[in-house]
Structures are given as C-alpha cells and as structure tokens.
Amino acid sequence: MESNREEVNSVEPPYELIWEKLESGGVIPFLGAGASLSCRPKDAHWKSPKDEFLPSGWELAKYLDDRSGYPSDNQLDLLRVAQYYDGVAGRGGLDDELHSIFSRAYAHGELHRFLAELKSPLIVTTNYDTLIEQAFEEKGRAYNVVVYKMSAPLVSVKRAGSGEWENVDPQRLALDLAGAPTIFKMHGSSIPGAPEEDSYVITEDDYVEFLTRMSGQTALPAIFGEPFRRSHFLFLGYGLRDWNLRVILHKIWKDWPRKYASWAIQERADPLEREFWRGRKLTIYEMTIADFLIKVREVAARV
C-alpha cells in the first residue's frame, strides 16, 4: 500500500500545460482556505483578532466556541459553532466578530502576487479575506469584485475603476470579463470600511440557503457560465472531501457541461478521494502550494 502511495505521489502536474493555460487565460483558479493559510508564519497558532495572520477553520471555530460557550467535545465544526454563536449573539454579533478578523489588511503571499500577474478573466474564492484584492492593488491592476450576498438573492458588485458597491440580480449581471479580471467571492466576504455590506456563508443555515439558491439559479452569476464551460479549473488550498464543495461543483458542471480537465494541488489525499475526483476529470497532485509555484515559475522562465 505504501509503495502505491509513493508511486502516486511521484506523478508530477503537467506544469507546461498549466502555465500555458494560465498565461492565456484558459484556467479559472479556485482558492480555498489553504491559499490564505499559505501566507502564515511556519508553526504559527492563531488565538485572537490581534494576531497578524489569518486563522484556520479549526482556530476560528475554537475562538467562537470560547466566546459563546458552545458545548463542544473538542470535535469543533465551524458551521455548527457559527450556528450556535448566531443563536447566542444574533447575526449582527456573529458578523461583527468575523468583520474584526477578516477586514484587516494581512500580508498576502506569493500565490496572491502570482495570480495578480495573470490574464485569468475569473478567479473564484471561498475565502472571506481580501488578500487577493490587496495583491491586485499592489500590482496597480484594475479588477472587478463580485460578492455573494447572504441577506438577499443578489450579488454585490464593485466594478473596475469604481469605489461604489451596487447590488445586482446575478442573472442580469453585466461585466466586461475581457476588460479586467473578476474576483468572485462565492461564500461572501468582509468589506473593509463598509461592515454593513459584509456577507458570510458560515453557518449551517447559510449553507442550506446557498445550496437552495444554487438550485434556483440565484447564487452564481449567469455571465460566468461561458468561462466555467470553456476553462480548466485549478483548485488551490482545498480539501476536496468537503461535501459542500462537491455539491457546488456538481451543480456547476451540470449547468455548464465541460470538456476540460481540472487539477487540484493538495498536500494529502486518500485513495477514495482521488478516485472520486478522477471520475470527474479532476486530478489531485499531492504537494504544497509553495512547491507548485516554484515549479510553475521555473517553467515560465524557461519558455
């Protein structure tokens, strides 16, 4: 069994193909929690909003648990803890806690700088932080931001060159995807300077509502259908065992059938997980994001 695992781990991603598609805008990067955690100091442990780096899901659940008196058994599930906190402090109290953590300008990492250099017309993230936006601003590149809105079947949009947010029906959203990259914050986001615009998919009820809107065509903007259909997906920082992600991708692939393979960079994956995704034309490569970026940059410098 161990030798089989070593053989699987020795398989390298198709770096030249991935770079070629990234450079030409033929890849949609999907950023999970691990993308933000890749910026943390090694062996760091988050304890409170005073820390200079972002929390993991478990650390955030532990913090909300300590603040709310959640009757935990050390098996902390963020969705359940957030649901309990909502019941104890109200939605406003939960959102205030999240805003205090995710609205800050943390140091973004090499991954975010790398993505801000690319021609990708669309970047999808399920993170609440603003690291990818900060990277675009550092590069001086204009970009659109589209945020799933928890409080209504709408999306919040800030267009390239505009400082104003507007609420739009996702089926009627019009954007020039070729004119400026678009960041789609599929699970909401903190909005620095405008906490009333914050939106977080974080409780059990939030996920039920999100999946309901997915079925009703009010969660994902229709304008993203064409790039979803005609692009490779590159998953960075995800644990692909997450059933919520499986449901979301099943819906995307059902509504916008694709003929393109997808790739995932993940530190560890079990055989069942690997087989499940292989059947959906998604190959998991076991490596760190940092090692993946080193290899891709080597290819970029060579070609």
Residue ranges and their predicted role:
Residues 1-303:
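SIR2/sirtuin NAD+-dependent deacylase catalytic core
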